[in-house]
């Protein structure tokens, strides 16, 4: 246990500040979404975002860096809530060296931080090393002073880090003894035991060898350090609590869950598990959503959906029958916003995403509840004491109803579920799916395999809005289904469709699939490698069954808006070629309803005059009303006609070519208008750089231009009314106001300078002499940080012997500035060190350069004492 029970937020700052004092650059946490790393779904360690630095692909901003990295791991999801060690979301503290310091410094600083900064008892800390790493043993034993019998040697499996060929090396871990009550009671229980007594809190990886892939190791020229320490695990040790769920910031989230659910720790093991699952999963979900992940049926979106639905399901087990996770979001944000201010900025968005997902899941559950009640009534009518496995399987398979909820609800009615029969049916379904895959069917998009017996989907939607087809496959929850009911989200594959799948930058159509007994609402369409169109959506009424005939109908308004934007995209490319030159190649595009984004190669920013001309040319082509002609031609013939292809794209033997009058001829598989006149109004929204040599234009068409125009007109009228003028004279009024504000600001700055000059004279006159230096502390209300800095700079520049701390309070916020004249700095007084002490004394933090440093505090009641300590600081630190 530490000498003081530091909070999670304190420990994070202590770690980062400590390594800053050791010359490390503090980097903010990287996003949970990996950047340019296809090997990871989500960032799962502090080292993961550092890979480009370790591999030499990117030059690090400094050879020493430290981070507190957000991480997600879902491999142990079934253990969440049952153990003290497992959590989906955690923060990983890490210090890294890229060819700078090595074992001596890494081990020494590790020990210093744990014992001197955190105050953990030395006799409860045990280092482990790789069995052959005598160098690490000598450092721990001789330099740190750990007795040999307290240093544990382990083999490659535990204490040697490598991943195939490439850089690798031994590691040294530090374990914390939590005490006998957490042990397994076995006589041989010691470091390395699987029980909860000895908890690994820090791992130092010494990357010093290169593995050639054949078991041969050579020394690396540049040796690196990669360390990791779980912030929550450190807090468990420092706060002397039972588990990750008992540390302060996490427990505060649990308190909110308790307040909503009425369940308390200790009521039962099952309720304790549910409270922990909800706490862990909503914590992870908030950070994932903030970093840009949205619930979906694939990839990291599926991870998020599973976490939210699992948490909602445990809410059901605690008796909550309404969306409640959205009410916990605020507490998660409150506990973490100090270090992650982006959470507060996105609070409304995060809450909305969580609420919508809860509501969608509730609809699934509600539909299953009704069917469960009908099944239950039938069982009771037959005087049965066991709820059949077949019914439980149907609830799960057709309605997406979780089996553990079925078990819970059946028990409430005095019945047990035949789980053996349920598992048998589940196994049979898996066997059927496995046998279907043996047909060597093509690998579907998102890993979905439909088999060779299902033909390619025939797209018939270029010239019609509706058609009739047959349901060939249904997939829900990653498994094939024969039937889906209302509320179930699924993928439906048809033999033919009018709905365009997302391709070539054009978004998918939306619409409906209507069967004899139900309606499936389509919100996305994707085409897999085998040519199947996968219709993503949800059953909104009745049921949809495999093999039944159905009517497919697109949303005609959405299709028309997409056509307007896509046709305008072709006209825009033609205008770019004419205005900017033939070097302009398409580098990417996005076509949405009445909105387009077009990336193109160009060596410089498009000038305002060029942009106006491009917009005018598109509008001219629209007004001309050129007919749209579509042809399917051999690729050689299309190229002979001069059709524009997407640079670097591979095409088949035949291609679809879209011609618009004499202005545009392009390879294209998208949907278009039959005449350019139907594009309607066209307006360029913006032009910007997206990469070196690549520019991007965004534009609106049709109804969106009308909506934007109306909105802008209304805004102009409102602004003119507010400024008591007319829209026509608005610019003149704005110029006058800008000039007036500029003049007033100059006068205000002059008055401030005069006031500051007088204030500084008074401050310097009242300065205290300490060791030959002039020490002064000044406290004022409502001075802006910039003004405080100006005042400090003048004091420092006018008096070389000055040591000053200036404080400004605005509400409960304290802004602090320390400045030191050149003589004071020369005598060992550093503003950065001074501001750290003063800030910490009033509940905050700070830092900076030797002659000027900024900080802040949160406890107004401690400000006077903090300022009173400046004289002692000067006396102590004088050289």
Predicted stretch roles:
Residues 1-879:
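A glycine- and charged-residue-rich anion-binding loop/surface
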